[in-house]
Amino acid sequence: MKIRKQFLLLFISTSHLFVYAQNTEPSVFTKEANEQVVKSLPFDNKQDFEDATRGFIATIDESSITDETGKEVYGLTVWDFLRQEAPASANPSLWRQGQLNRIHGLFEVLPGKIYQIRGFDLANMTFIRSDNGWIVIDVLLSKETALAGYNLLKKHVEDLPVKAVIYTHPHVDHFAGIDAILENAPNKPEAIEIIGPKGFFEDAVSENLMAGVAMGRRATYMYGRSLPKNEKGNIGTGLGQTTAAGTTGLVPPTREISEEGETLRIDGVEIVFMSVPGAEAPSEIMMYFPGMKAFCVAEEINRTLHNLLTLRGAKVRNGQLWSKYIDRAITECG
């Protein structure tokens, strides 16, 4: 099998000439609004923190993930200021979300079966143990962050052949780190099946290449990338802390999941694919693993509000259709 590789110019790490606004003390209005948030939400409930740290195995020693030249691709300790209590200048709910999202490393989700890399990029990277290797779900945004996570798995769990890579959907933070897996797996890239939803490649090119310049510029504002990372600047993006600024690539799927969904057995692991197009992404798949009683929700369900309209200009999501997909998942796999 010959793998066709195409690299995208994703405008993730372009420099911008922005003048930082002077940091000022929060107004009385801001302070009162933030105080009201504290009163309206159950901040004494620490279950989120227990969930976010459960199964922690290890993380890297370095303060950041860098490329081959030593340039920072993704900062880790830069978010350490979030350890303190929320200041009057910050929305305490977003601050708490940042505290959760800054937790990073390798986690065991299901003993001996499912492992996850978190906090190395905006998305997570998941490893499913098959009979003779690994099935990888989503590969982060950059080669560097994905490789840091992959090496952590090899070091603390096991270095096994990669049997398949599954893209859940064509948002760049879920597929662009693919080269880290293909170039560093112990088996040949040609032996790795790449699975994605129907229409994945077309949707990835449409959003990230055709509209890449404009969307990249808007994303800079949306994520507050040029703001300093401190209590009066960037404290996170809600869904994750920030996006990586490294090497990106795109390898088309070798197999697409039909819109009707289907069931596959990959190296002994049964996977029931549920196609959910037109909701969180133009094309997307969720997965149920009957043998493990595990369900991968892709980005249809998060511990955030459902993102119906992104400020970067992605397609508007169909909220009604989205809700029906969640109902279907509960009915069929709950």
Task: Label the model's feature ranges.
Residues 9-16:
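Bacterial N-terminal signal peptides
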Residues 99-160, 285-289, 293-299:
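Conserved beta-strand hairpin/beta-sheet module of binuclear metal-dependent hydrolase folds
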Residues 22-102, 326:
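N-terminal pre-domain segments of enzymes
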Residues 132-133, 143-195, 258:
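Active-site metal-binding motif and surrounding structural segment of the metallo-beta-lactamase
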Residues 17-21:
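Sec/Tat signal peptide C-region and signal peptidase I cleavage site
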Residues 1-8:
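Bacterial N-terminal signal peptides that target proteins for export
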